[in-house]
Amino acid sequence: MGELMAFLLPLIIVLMVKHSNSRTHSLRYFRLGVSDPIRGVPEFISVGYVDSHPITTYDSVTQQKEPRAPWMAENLAPDHWERYTQLLRGWQQMFKVELKRLQRHYNHSGSHTYQRMIGCELLEDGSTTGFLQYAYDGQDFLIFNKDTLSWLAVDNVAHTIKRAWEANQHELQYQKNWLEEECIAWLKRFLEYGKDTLQRTEPPLVRVNRKETFPGVTTLFCKAHGFYPPEIYMTWMKNGEEIVQEMDYGDILPSGDGTYQTWASFELDPQSSNLYSCHVEHCGVHMVLQVPQESEAIPLVMKAVSGSIVFVIVLTGVGVLVWRRRPREQNGAVYLPTPD
C-alpha cells in the first residue's frame, strides 16, 4: 500500500499544478473507487491536499483517516481523526454501491473506476472558487455548478443521476455552502497550521542551454528548479515577442526535496539572427535571460540573502541578463563570481 500511495500522490500533484504567475492556495479532496482491483490496490482511496501537499489519507485496507503532514497531526485532536474515519467508511460503502450501479447502467464488467474531486481555492485578490465533480473510468461524468445549483451531465447515464440529485434542493444548497464557506474556513485554518511550509518562498535556479536534439536540429532549453511555491510563469521570446505556438512545456514536477522543477524549449533556426530570451516570473520577481547565438549555457542562480536578492551568473560565450523587479521592491542586485 505504501508503494501505491508513493506513486499516486506525485501523480495527483502533476495533475494539479499549472503554469501561472499568480499565487493561489487550494484545498482538494480526491476519492477513488475501483471495482475488481488488482492485488495491492485498495478498492477505495481518499487523499486530501493543501496546495500540492498531501495532508490526509484513507484507504479500504487501513480503514483509518491519517495525517500526512506533521502540522496536521500536531493541531488536530484524536477525535477529529476518529470522526472523519467513520465518515469515510460510509463513503467507502457508498462508492462501492454507486460503482456497481454505474457498471450495470453501462453493461460493464471487470475493473472500472469512479472518482470524486471536491475543493476550493483562495486567490491572490481574496476571491474564492469552489468545485465538485465526478468521473467514471477517468472521464468527466457529472460537474456541479454551485451558482445555478445544477449538475452538468455528459451522457444519458449521467442525466439519470442528474435528475435524481437535482430533486434534492437541500443537498444542492448544502454543497454550495460547503464549497463557499466551510471549505474556505478549513483552508485558512490549514494554511495557518502549516504556514512555515505552505507560505514560504524559495526562488528558482534557472539555466539556459542549447542542445542538438536531432541531426541539424538545435533546441534551446530554459530550465528552472529549486522553487516554491510551484506556481511559475516561463516563456521564450523572439525579438521581444512571445513564441507560444513554437514552444514545448514540461510539467511542473516535485523535485523530492519540497521544491519544484520545470522547463520550456523550442527549436532554434541555426541560420537566424534573431535575439531570443527566456522569461521567468515567480512570486513577483521577473528574470530575463537573453541568449545570443554563440552562447551555449547561461546558468542563473537567485538566492535571498539578508533581505536582498543575489544573482550569480556564469557565462559561456556572451550573454546578457536583464533584471526587473516590482516597483515596491527597491533592493539592488549584487553580482558575484563563481568557480568554473
Curated annotation (Swiss-Prot):
Residues 203-282 form the Ig-like C1-type domain. 7-hydroxy-6-methyl-8-(1-D-ribityl)lumazine binds at residues 31, 46, 65, 116, 174-175. One of its GO terms (cellular component) is early endosome membrane. Glycans are attached at residue 107. 5-(2-oxopropylideneamino)-6-(D-ribitylamino)uracil binds at residues 31, 46, 65, 116, 174-175. N-glycosylated. Residues 23-109 are annotated as: Alpha-1. Antigen-presenting molecule specialized in displaying microbial pyrimidine-based metabolites to alpha-beta T cell receptors (TCR) on innate-type mucosal-associated invariant T (MAIT) cells. In complex with B2M preferentially presents riboflavin-derived metabolites to semi-invariant TCRs on MAIT cells, guiding immune surveillance of the microbial metabolome at mucosal epithelial barriers. Belongs to the MHC class I family. This is Major histocompatibility complex class I-related gene protein. The gene is MR1.
